[in-house]
Amino acid sequence: MQETEKQFHIHCTEGDVGRYVILPGDPGRCESIAQHFDNPVHIGMNREYNIWTGYLLGEKVSVCSTGIGGPSAAIAMEELHNIGADTFLRVGTCGGIALDILPDDVVVATGAIRYEHTSMEYAPIEFPAVPDFEVTAALKAAGEELGYNTHVGVVQCKDSFYGQHSPEKSPVYYELLNKWESWKRLGVKASEMESAALFVVAAALGVRCGSCFHVIWNQEREKAGLFMPMSEDTSGAIKVCIEALKKLIESDRAKAK
């Protein structure tokens, strides 16, 4: 397959997407994200990959869902890069770990624990999963300027959702629980499932990537008997992502002059 041909999984070709791409996990969120674009057009959907393209500040931008977990997210990034994308902003949901992380807060990742295996196909375990600094700074600034309670720090990435939420069912429950205790003691902010893979794949490809998350809930606060509502409205994190993307577009234009 030639890199500029129709991509095997996302079914897109060169010209279908912009250089800037937002990466939610849920295909159902793509249309609502695209409504923040000017003149959004549905490019297509195959498997978990739902793709829309439009414009922000006159710049061509896209949104492509990745599904759940590292393998499908890595495929999306590789195929989007094949047809011209070079800046990726993941927006999704997470569960809080640190006790000060509340539902409806926004978390911006400064690094990701590689408690998954997709990234090992791209870099040895000694290599850190870290986002692009400029993308991360734009996400942090956008969250704060929009008035969201924005946390910045390390997130944990996993392959098994139920390994976190029902570890006692696993034959290796003791390992899962010990690791979880380590994450807590190390001040990890939240848990999700894609960023470690995306950060390492981005490094391997030489592209930019950053992540921000909407906090759904915090199981550690619940265990501690603290106030713990649940929040599934991701619109805040999406707005943060859109504003961060505008900042990046403006910054890139200024550097190009």
Q: Positions of the model-derived regions?
A:
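His/Asp/Glu-rich mid-to-C-terminal helical/loop segments that flank catalytic regions of hydrolases
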Residues: Q219-K257
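Metabolite-binding pocket within alpha/beta catalytic cores that recognizes anionic/polar moieties
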Residues: M1-A138
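Generic non-transmembrane alpha-helical segments
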Residues: A138-L146, V201, V240-S251
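Zn-dependent metallopeptidase/amidohydrolase metal-coordination segment
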Residues: A196-M230
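Short acidic/polar active-site loop segments enriched in Thr and Asp
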Residues: D86-T87, K189, R208
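Glycine-rich beta-alpha junction loops
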Residues: P27, G95, Q156-Y162, A197, ...
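Active-site rim beta-loop-alpha module in soluble metabolic enzymes
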Residues: V130-G187
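Flexible, glycine/charged-enriched surface loops at secondary-structure junctions
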Residues: P40-G44, G147-V154, E250-K257
